[in-house]
């Protein structure tokens, strides 16, 4: 059984209906996780408010074994179909985030915004205006350093999107 299944937490949604391990349309490796929520499947709310969208509960959990002295790298590839629209209704959805136990807000988060994405670093910094490349894979690599002391030559958070550093 793929490791990805063991690290995924489920809510009340039917696993067979909304999630599967696929072997086709895979970016890297032999398999991928596919999450799919169709219109109207958000607790009869028609997915109109982000807080009521149930895919927020389909989270891939990752617990890094790295020490806080070393940078931590994360990678995510997401396929955006050609018909991915600009519908602003319920267009905010977290794709990728890091949280600290006991802290409500994510340390950093990459989320959808219309037909693109935004990057948030806590409450204080936000990067806007990146449109997804439709009909293809969008690759994200995050390098972050959670150590307590700051070093002038090192950034706390660095992001590459499709091989280009954007911060």
Feature map (PLM): residue ranges:
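Low-complexity, Ser/Thr/Pro/Gly-rich disordered linker/stalk regions
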Residues: 1-167
């Amino acid at each position: 059984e793929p490791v990805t299944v063991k690290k995924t937490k489920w809510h009340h949604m039917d696993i067979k209906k909304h999630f599967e391990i696929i072997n086709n349309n895979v970016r890297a490796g032999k398999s991928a996780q596919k999450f799919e929520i169709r219109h109207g499947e958000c607790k009869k709310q028609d997915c109109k408010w982000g807080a009521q969208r149930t895919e927020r509960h389909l989270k891939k959990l990752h617990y890094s074994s790295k020490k806080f002295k070393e940078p931590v790298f994360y990678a995510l590839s997401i396929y955006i179909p050609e018909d991915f629209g600009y519908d602003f209704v319920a267009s905010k959805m977290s794709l990728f985030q890091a949280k600290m136990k006991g802290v409500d807000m994510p340390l950093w988060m990459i989320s959808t915004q219309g037909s693109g994405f935004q990057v948030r670093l806590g409450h204080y910094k936000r990067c806007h205006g990146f449109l997804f490349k439709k009909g293809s894979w969008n690759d994200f690599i995050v390098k972050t350093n959670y150590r307590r002391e700051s070093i002038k030559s090192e950034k706390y958070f660095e992001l590459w999107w499709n091989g280009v550093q954007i911060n």
